[in-house]
Structures are given as C-alpha cells and as structure tokens.
Amino acid sequence: MSETTKDDGSSQKKSVRKEKRAYVLRKWTQFDVGRASTVGTVHLLCLLAPFNYKWEAFRFGIILAILTNLCITFSYHRNLTHRSFKLPKWLEYPFAYSALLALQGDPLDWVSIHRFHHQFTDSDRDPHSPIEGFWFSHVLWIFDTDYIREKCGRRNNVMDLKQQWFYRFLKKTLVLHILAFWTLIYLWGGLPYLTWTVGFGGVIGYHGTWLVNSACHICGSQAWQTNDTSRNVWWLALLTMGESWHNNHHAFETSARHGLEWYQLDITWYLIWFFQALGLATNVKLPTDAQKRKMAIRR
C-alpha cells in the first residue's frame, strides 16, 4: 500500500484492488432491501409521470428537484462534508433537512461515505470508484452495505455531526420524514404531483449525484495533478449545480467554489456567495494562488 499527499497536507492511501465479489447472489441486509425498494419506487413513479401529466405538477416537480438537490450540494456536500463555509445553526439545519427530502439518505450516512471517498479515492477502499465498473460507481454500491463496511471500516469519521442532536434525530427518524413528505405530496396533488415530484424530480436528483461518482471519474479533462481519475465534465455542470468540476474539487477539497474559472458554471457557489454577501456564510474557503501553482498540471 502506498500513500500520496494532497495540497492540504492530508494523506490518501492507495492499494491494489480486491477481486470484485458476486453482487446478486449475496446476503442482502434489511437496509439494502429498503434502499433498493426506495430507488426502485422512485424510478417506477418516474415512468408513470408521462401518463399523469399536468403542467402545474410538472412545474412543481422541476422546482422542487432544483431546490432539494441544491440543498444536497450546498448543505450535505460543501457545508457538512468539507466544512467549506460556516452557517449559523438556525440556517444550517433547515438546509440539511431540505436535503433529506432529495431521498439520498440522512446527513450522517451521506457525509461519512463522501469523506471515505476522498480519503481512499480510486483505491480498493473507495466506496464508489469506477475501477470496479461504471455501474458499480454509479448506483450498485448503494445496495451493498456489508461490502462498503468491509472496504471502509466503521463510520467513525462523522463524530463532529454525531455530537449534534439534530443529525442523530434525522438518522433515527429518516423513514418517517420521507413517508410524511410523500403523503403530503399525494394529499396535495394526487398521483400527478407524486409522479412528477417524487418520481421525475427524484430521478433527476439521483442521477445528477450518481454521475459525479461515475462519469466524473471516467470522462472529461484534468487541470490539476490529483493522482486520481477525477475529471471536469462541463456538460454536467447545470444538472449537478456545479459539482461536475470534479477535478477542481479533488484538487482543492475544502474549496467552497468548484467552478474556479469565471466560465465554469457553479450554481452552488453562487448561493454560497450570496449568503457570504449577507454576512451569513463565514469562513468561506477558497484555494490560494500558491496552492493552484503547486497543483497545476505542467503542459
């Protein structure tokens, strides 16, 4: 096993990939079955959406998908995972709760997995590297809890969040919040709203996030020496709210801004900048010129 050092001084362990185990013919935990059922239900509702079309339902689904998935990138990713900026708790918690409605899990689980990804990028301990195949990195890893635990170990990398009652509460009551959300949507607008909001909107959010894990480690360009497969994929920037400038992100993990060039669309950064201008987002981290010179690929 070898070790490389990133620009922020953190180490990243590399090792030889383990032989990939059988996927279908294995023990499925209750959590695996539950998550697969949720993802399957969302995709089924998406398939039903065209047969339940209403303009107002379609419009609401698009708006809610944008808002909840922006909360994933703003809250779960840049605020909670990387501490790229700081918010007052009265603002941090509502954003985290809104991200919960994007159906990508509770904050403790999401943040832990992503921190492991950066700690073990493209090694046999990376929870979702495309070295085990596109579809594994895109979605299949989600349904194999035991394998992820075997690769990464105990999820003791989120103690900063576990110390807060709010995040422990969300983890324990995740299913109740999701069921309540789905029920309210159905009671408000019936099947059209359910299919376009939970189904269509959920699928957009799922695959936007998943493409960062898969496509952004396979295709695209590299501007920085990150010693991994991370890529900048311009055509995913809008769908991912700026997350697809993934090589930028792996080079400067704690940066609140992923689209480092003026022409690199980064909607999440624009929101962070807005709150910074209001004095609500503080300790906003950006790479220095010295860090950029150190990490730049010499052409």
From Swiss-Prot:
Annotated CDD domains: Delta9-FADS-like (cd03505)
Name recorded for this polypeptide: Delta-9 desaturase-like 2 protein
Protein source organism: Arabidopsis thaliana
Gene Ontology cellular component annotations, sorted alphabetically: endoplasmic reticulum membrane
Known EC number: 1.14.19.-
Family indicated by similarity: Belongs to the fatty acid desaturase type 1 family.
Transmembrane segments: 55-75, 174-194, 262-282
Superkingdom, taxonomy of origin: Eukaryota
Lineage of producing organism: Eukaryota, Viridiplantae, Streptophyta, Embryophyta, Tracheophyta
Keyword set includes Endoplasmic reticulum: yes
Domain notes: The histidine box domains may contain the active site and/or be involved in metal ion binding.
Pathway info: Lipid metabolism; polyunsaturated fatty acid biosynthesis
Pfam families: FA_desaturase
